[in-house]
Structure formats: structure tokens, C-alpha cells
Amino acid sequence: MIFTPTQKELFNKNIEALGNILLKESLKEIKSSKFELILGKDNLDINLKDTSDNTFLYENVIDELNSMLNTYNDKYLLYPVLYFYGFGNGILFKALLQNKNHQHIVVFEKDIEIIWVMFHILDFSSELQSARLMVLNTNKLEIQDYNELCSSKPFFQFSRIYFLELMSHYYERFHEDILGLNKKLAENFKNSIVFHGNDPLDALQGIEQFVYNLPQMITHPSYKELLSKRKGVSDTAIIVSTGPSLTKQLPLLKKYASKATIFCADSSYPILAKHGIKPDYVCMLERTEITAEFFNHDFGEFDNGICFIIKSIVHPNAINYLTKKTDNFTIVSTYASFIQYLKLDYFGYFNMGFSVAHMACYLSLHLNHKNIIFIGQDLAYAENGNSHPDDYQNSANYESQMYEHILTEAYGGKEKIKTHHVWLMFKRNLEQDVQKIQKYLDTKVYNCTEGGARIEGTIEKPFLWACENLLDKDLNKPFEKLEPLSLNKQNEFLLKAYYKVCKSIEHCRDFNDNFIKVYDKIKNSFMSLQNSQKNEIFIQEIIQDIDKTKTQIDELYNTQKDLIQILGPLLTQFELNLARIYVLNPKTKEDAFNKSILWIKEHLEFMELVYGHIKAQENALIKNILPLEEKLKERKLDKWMERVRK
């Protein structure tokens, strides 16, 4: 296909405006195309003929364009984001973007020759420059691309109304690609919802267990102490998880245990103890009571020299079991808003991911390991259907029937293997992080599980190869002992924590006292709505009051971080559901009235939930501050407690 100098100039203008650098480079490399341009009498009648099979992009350009426009202006007029598979001639996008409600149109294209041709014919520079038109090459999409799209505004906020539209029948030939793309987008939206928090009760449990665990955190060695004494003492970390493949790796792990730092999951700790393999670190992340039971053992001298790294929101039973057998444990936090509100920064924070293997991986990075080896990281069922090794405390088939089975690519990439959606989520999050580690750090990540699911980005090697090639000398074990702060420093932090928790109880009360007044005002206004001429003005006043209230809640992110942790998941779920009402397109005055009524009702229910959750947090803080009070009394700090309360 030969283009005029003017058309080439237009192509360059479009390319310059394109934000997607990879696509920009790929388009520049194209010199010719299998597509033939077919122009009709109408300026909008632009079709392409695929000369490889003599098929056309559209059967009837104008009819299909009008049909699409009618549908979108009727059903999807208020949708902030639209998704299309196939660029087509691009005219539909230019027409739809005349509607200011459409903030973004995301277009996925597999055959970028189509874009190459159309960039010579039509000017998309304005739409591309503003990113209202976003074009993605499905052949080049990475894990990170899906993650960034599905977790950012406004794409995440409107994820519950996501659907993928086919540009024309021509694109049905790419049905495998379409199904794969659709699946990945749906999965990534789901992951983003989990990441933002999908259960306020989980958040509440985290807050109450964190407050309950505060005295133990403050009176034991800190994460800062761990980093200062242990950073760089070893090059290679072995992360021991509890997949079915672990059993076959244990003899080799025992043989080479002295030559690597061993991080083990809480669930693999009793298994290693049984086989006489001493880990250097045992990590615990989950907040459940059943997880705490992995520490309900008396292994005697075996525990000497083991450092237990515990997330600050674990179940108190876990810490009670530990205190009976060792004082060598460190309690560390993530960057949760309530935890940051307390400003106990000395005890440290790090992002721990969603699984204990994830937590161990991050920890090994912070301790400057150059090689990270995963074993037992199956994230899939064994051939016999077992979810865990035979020695697993809760039985080898503990998760065998818990979830629906899903097929995923197996270790080695030659077959499929059964997994479930939770393991898949762990796998995807691990893959995202491995991608960043390999890209930005001088660290190699090896998957030596020799079974289970493939973890993209890791280097798959037999465990024996890793031991023989990466482990050459004994380490000086046990590593240097960690010490807690002086008693005076501990007392200072105990009082500081007590003060902040007391203030948070006060914040809950003050917030709810004001909030109930606003709620009552809005509810009374709503109840007095009558079918009168003033309804429209009255409704707008109520909606303005609602908007003010939501703004005040949003401001808590900056003003009162202690309240936002429990409200965050509630807000997320509410906004995701509200999107479905937001995009309803009323055709009549009655439709508009009904939409407004529904909008107000939803917000009143939301306000009731906000009040209830803040009240629940207040009660949880009052109950779980008791261990802190007992520790302060034990240390004869009663009079300081009184001062704090006043």
C-alpha cells in the first residue's frame, strides 16, 4: 500500500501522540500490509480488505457504525470507560468520544497492521494525546500491564460494569485471544478488589489483634534490630513452603541446611522439626486461629536459634504459644493505616504480600540475599489430589475439596495441572513481584519445587542443581542474637501506644456523634419527599448533603488514618456497587426520579454501615487495650496512664 506525503505526515502525528511506547515502536517497524483500503462514497465508509483470505473488516460499514452508535448512546451513554476488542477503522471511537461522559476508551488489537493503515487515514492525535483513546497490543501485554490498568482510576472504580465489545465479525477469528484477554482482565479486576480490601470485618479483626499484640511487639526485638544485625550475612535464601512436592526435597535440604538461610512458612515449621532440619526464620502472616496452631508444639532445644518473624495482626494464640517456648521473635507490621497512625515506626514495616511465602521472599530481599530459592511452592494439587505433604499438620488433603479446581500451566510448561482460585491469586502476585525483582534488583529467583504450577519469571532448576551451584560454604550459624530495647525505651513506646489507642477511641466517639446528626438530617429530608413540584430541587439538596458527607469521609485519609482502615473496604465495595446505578441512563422524568431515589437509598444504607463499623471499632479498641493496660500496671506506670486518659 502506497501512502501520500500528507498521509505519512498524519501517521507520524498519530504516532507522536501515542503514549504506548512499545506499540509506537512496533508500528514504526511496519513497512507494508496485507490490508487493502476500500473507500466508499460516504466519508465515513472506510473499510479494509484482508488480502490473505479476501475477507472484510466490516460487512456494511455505515450500517454497523450506526447500529453501534445507537446502542452505545442508548445503553452506555453514561459509562466512564468502554472496552473494545479490535481497532477497526477507528471512526466509532472518534464519534463516541464526543460524549464527555466517556473518560476513556480502551482498545485491544491483535493485528496492529490495521492500526498502521488507519493512522495514515484519520487523525486520532487529540484522542491519543489526552489518553481518552488507549490502544494496547494484545501480543505484547505483560502481567504488569494488566495489573496497572485494573488497579488504577477510573478503571478499577467501574470494574463491576466491565464488558468487552467486539468491533466487528472479522475479529471472531481471534476468539482464543479474546477469551484469554477477557479472563485475564476479569481476574486482575478481582485481584485489585481483594488488594483494596473486600471485607471490613477482616480489617476489624486486624485492628483488634494488632492492638492486643502491642505489648509483645514493643517488648521484643524489633525489625530494625533484625536488619541492623542480619543484613548481608548470607547470599542465598531457601524459602520452604508446604506444597505436596516438599517431601522429596527434604533430604537435600537437610544436607545443605548449613550453607543457606532457611526461611520456612509457619505450616512447614512442624514438618522441618520432625525431620530435624532447623530453619533460621519461621514466618507467620495469617490472622486466623487455625494458623496459630502451627506454633502449638514443644520442640525443646530444636527452637534454640530460630527467629520467628510474625505479622503484627496474627491471632494472639500464636504469640501466647511462642512466649511459652522462646523470646526470640520479632513482630512486624505492614503499612496499614491504623498501624501507621500509631507511629511506632521504630518497629518497622514491610509489604508482605498475600501469602507467607510472599512474606518470606520480601524478608529475604530486605536481608540482601542475592539468590532466592523456592521449594514446596506448588500452588497446585499433586497427581493424587493432595493439597499438602503427608506430614502436613491439618492433613494432606486439607484443601483438596475446599475450592473448585481450575487448570493452569504446570512447572516445566509441558502440561496443565489442577489448582484453585486462591493459589492462582498468590501465583499472579508472586509473578508480578518476581518480574520487578528480576528487572530492578541484582537478585535471581529460582523455582526448585520440581512440581506444581509454573511461576512465570522464576528460573526453573532442579533443587540439586541449585544446591551444588549456589551453596558452597557453611554459614556462621546461629546468626547473631537480637536484643529488645532497654526497659526505659520500652516503657516510652508502651505509653505512646496507649495514648494513641485512647485517642482513637475518642475519635470513634466524636466521629459518630457528628455523623449521626448528618444522617438524621438526610433521612428526615428523604422521608418528607412528596410528589410535588419542589421534588427536583429537594432531591438535589439531599444529594448535595450526601456529597458533602462523602467528602468528609474521604478527608479521613489525610486527617484520621485510624478510622480509614475499617472504612476503606466498606468504601471500596460501596463505590463498586454504586457504579451500576451511576451508569443507568434515564429516558423520562420518572426514570430520573427513580434513579435519584435509588441513589439516596443506597447512600443512607451506606451511612448506617459507616456508623455501625466505627462503633464496632470503638468497642474492639476498648476490649483489646486491656493487655496494654496490664503491662503498664505491671511496670508501675499507673499514674502515667491516668495522665494519658485525662
Q: What residues fall within each predicted segment?
A:
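Active-site/ligand-binding-proximal alpha/beta "capping" segment
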Residues: 316-375, 379
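Extended, hydrophobic alpha-helical segments in both membrane/secreted and soluble proteins
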Residues: 262-268, 308, 357-360, 376
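Glycine-rich phosphate/pyrophosphate-binding loops
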Residues: 109, 268-269, 276-286, 364-391
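Generic beta-strand/beta-sheet core signal
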Residues: 241, 265, 285, 309-311, ...
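Long alpha-helical, hydrophobic tracts
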Residues: 252, 260, 342, 346, ...
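N-terminal donor/sugar-recognition subdomains of glycan-related enzymes
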Residues: 1-237, 244-261, 270-274, 281, ...
